C-alpha cells in the first residue's frame, strides 16, 4: 500500500534528531531507545544489508555498537560509553585524528562567516587551497578541481584525461587487477572487483586491466593497444592498493610505469585518495620513488576527518583543456568554504606536527610487531605488510579474518576488512596514534590470535 506523505511525522523526526544533536550524554533509557531506533531505521529506510555486515564484526552477534561521538584524537565512543581505539580510521579519513582542534576551529570560524559560496563571486579559500596544493604536490602539478569524495576526484581525472587525449585519438584507459577507484560509472570502470561491476554492466568502453605490479604486462598492453589503434589515453594506478588488500608493488614499478607512459604518450593518473596526506610516511606515496603524475587524485584525509572534500590536481598542460570553458566539469558543493577551511587546516597540522614522519616511525613499530606475531601464529596469519600506517594482516581464510575483527572489537580495538580482499584486515589508524596506543594494539592482537587459535583447535 502506498503511504501518504506526512509533514507532521517528518517534523517530529527532525525535532527528535535536533534534540539528540544538542545532547552530550545519554542516560541508560535514552541509549536503549536510540539503539532501537537506529537499528529500525537502518532496516526500514537506509539498507538492511548494512545491519548484517555490522553483525559480522560485532562481539556477541548483536548491534550493540551504535556510534555516538569521538573520544580522544584516536578513539571513538559508542552509546554505551565504551571507548575504542580506532585502527580503521574511517577507511583513511582521520589522519590528523578525530575532531582535531585546529581543523574544527577553522571550520567553526568559517561557519560563523559564510558556510557556502555564492557560485558567482570568487571564493578566497578555494584559491588558497589550490595554491597550497600546487606548492605541496610533486612535480609540475599546478591546478586543482575540488569535489566532495574520492570517487568524484577519480571521475574528474578520467574526464580530464579524456578531454586532453580525445583530440589526439587516444581513448583507452589501463587500470590494474585488484584496483579500487570508486563506484560511480567511470570510476567503477577502472575498479577491478566483479562483485561491484557485474550488476552495472556494460560499463564505460575502453578500459583494460593488467596485473598490478607487473611491468611487463603493462608494456605488453600498451604495445598491443597501439598496434590495434586503441591508443592509451591514460594509465590509472594506486601507488599502494588499499582495498585490494594493501598490496605494495615491487620496488621500481612506479618509476617504470612513468617511463612507459612517457614512451607511449599516455597520461599517468595516480589515485592517492587513500595513500595521500602522510599515510605512508611521505605526504604522497609516489614521493617514495620520486614519481610525478600528470593527474593526482586526493580525498579522504584531505578534509581532516571533519569535512568531505576531494581534489583532482593536474599539470597546466593537461588542465588547460578546461580553460576555455571552465563549466565543462563542475559541482555545486565542490570547493565550498567549509571544506576548504578543513583542508587548509589539515595540511597545516600535517606539516606543523610532521605527521608523515610519525606515520613512518609508528608504522614500522606496528608492522614489526605484526610480523613477529605472524611468525608465532603461522596457522592463522598468512602475511603482514604495509608502508607507514597503511598496514594489512592477511589471514589463511576469510572466516579467520572475520573472527579476528570480532575479537579485536571485544578488546575495544576497531578494525575492518578491505573491500577487494576479504581475507585481509587493515590497520589504518590516525597518524596521531600514541606509542602507548600502538603497544595496546599489539597486545590486543596477540590476545585475539591466542583466542582464535583455541577456537580453531576446539572446532
UniProtKB/Swiss-Prot annotation:
User: Which source organism?
Assistant: Enterobacter sp. (strain 638)
Q: What protein name applies here? A: Putrescine aminotransferase
GO-annotated molecular function: diamine transaminase activity; identical protein binding; putrescine--2-oxoglutarate transaminase activity; pyridoxal phosphate binding
Which cofactors does this gene product need? pyridoxal 5'-phosphate
The family annotation for this protein states: Belongs to the class-III pyridoxal-phosphate-dependent aminotransferase family. Putrescine aminotransferase subfamily.
The coiled-coil regions, if any, are none
Instruction: Enumerate the PANTHER family for this protein.
Output: AMINOTRANSFERASE CLASS III, PUTRESCINE AMINOTRANSFERASE
Gene Ontology process terms (BP): L-lysine catabolic process; putrescine catabolic process
Its recorded reaction(s) are:
an alkane-alpha,omega-diamine + 2-oxoglutarate = an omega-aminoaldehyde + L-glutamate; putrescine + 2-oxoglutarate = 1-pyrroline + L-glutamate + H2O; cadaverine + 2-oxoglutarate = 5-aminopentanal + L-glutamate
- What are its E.C. numbers? 2.6.1.82, 2.6.1.29
Amino acid at each position: 500500500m502506498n503511504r501518504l506523505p506526512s509533514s507532521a511525522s517528518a517534523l517530529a523526526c527532525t525535532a527528535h534528531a535536533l534534540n539528540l544533536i544538542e545532547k552530550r550524554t545519554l542516560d541508560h533509557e535514552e541509549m536503549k531507545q536510540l539503539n532501537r531506533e537506529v537499528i529500525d531505521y537502518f532496516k526500514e529506510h537506509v539498507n538492511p544489508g548494512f545491519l548484517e555486515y555490522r553483525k559480522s564484526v560485532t562481539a556477541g552477534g548483536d548491534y550493540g555498537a551504535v556510534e555516538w561521538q569521538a573520544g580522544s584524537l584516536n578513539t571513538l565512543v559508542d552509546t554505551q560509553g565504551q571507548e575504542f581505539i580506532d585502527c580503521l580510521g574511517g577507511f583513511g579519513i582521520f589522519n590528523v585524528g578525530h575532531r582535531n582542534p585546529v581543523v574544527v576551529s577553522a571550520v567553526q570560524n568559517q561557519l560563523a562567516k559564510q558556510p557556502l559560496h555564492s557560485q558567482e563571486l570568487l571564493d578566497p579559500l578555494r584559491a588558497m587551497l589550490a595554491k597550497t596544493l600546487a606548492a605541496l604536490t610533486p612535480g609540475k602539478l599546478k591546478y586543482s578541481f575540488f569535489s566532495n569524495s574520492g570517487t568524484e576526484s577519480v571521475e574528474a581525472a578520467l574526464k580530464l584525461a579524456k578531454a586532453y587525449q580525445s583530440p589526439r585519438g587516444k581513448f583507452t584507459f589501463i587500470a590494474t587487477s585488484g584496483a579500487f577507484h570508486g563506484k560511480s560509472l567511470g570510476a567503477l570502470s577502472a575498479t577491478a572487483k566483479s562483485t561491484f561491476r557485474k550488476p552495472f554492466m556494460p560499463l564505460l568502453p575502453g578500459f583494460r586491466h593488467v596485473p598490478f605490479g607487473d611491468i611487463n604486462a603493462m608494456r605488453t598492453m600498451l604495445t598491443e593497444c597501439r598496434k590495434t589503434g586503441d591508443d592509451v589515453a591514460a594509465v590509472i594506478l594506486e601507488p599502494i592498493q588499499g582495498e585490494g588488500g594493501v598490496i605494495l608493488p615491487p620496488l621500481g614499478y612506479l618509476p617504470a610505469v612513468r617511463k612507459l607512459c612517457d614512451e607511449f604518450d599516455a597520461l599517468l593518473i595516480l589515485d592517492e585518495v587513500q595513500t595521500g596526506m602522510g599515510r605512508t610516511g611521505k605526504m604522497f606515496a609516489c614521493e617514495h620513488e620520486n614519481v610525478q603524475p600528470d593527474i593526482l587524485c586526493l580525498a579522504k584525509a584531505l578534509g581532516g576527518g571533519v569535512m568531505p572534500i576531494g581534489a583532482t590536481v593536474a599539470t597546466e598542460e593537461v588542465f588547460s583543456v578546461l580553460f576555455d570553458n571552465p563549466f565543462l566539469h563542475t559541482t555545486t558543493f565542490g570547493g565550498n568554504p567549509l571544506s576548504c577551511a578543513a583542508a587548509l587546516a589539515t595540511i597545516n597540522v600535517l606539516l606543523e606536527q610532521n605527521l608523515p614522519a610519525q606515520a613512518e616511525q609508528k608504522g614500522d613499530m606496528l608492522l614489526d610487531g605484526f610480523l613477529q606475531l605472524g611468525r608465532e601464529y603461522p596457522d592463522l596469519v598468512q602475511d603482514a605488510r604495509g608502508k607507514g600506517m597503511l598496514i594489512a594482516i592477511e589471514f589463511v581464510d576469510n572466516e579467520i579474518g572475520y573472527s579476528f575483527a570480532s575479537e579485536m572489537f571485544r578488546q575495544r580495538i576497531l578494525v575492518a576488512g578491505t573491500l577487494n580482499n576479504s581475507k585481509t584486515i587493515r590497520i589504518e589508524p590516525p597518524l596521531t596514534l600514541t606509542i602507548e596506543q600502538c603497544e595496546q594494539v599489539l597486545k590486543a592482537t596477540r590476545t585475539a590470535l591466542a583466542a582464535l587459535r583455541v577456537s580453531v583447535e576446539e572446532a
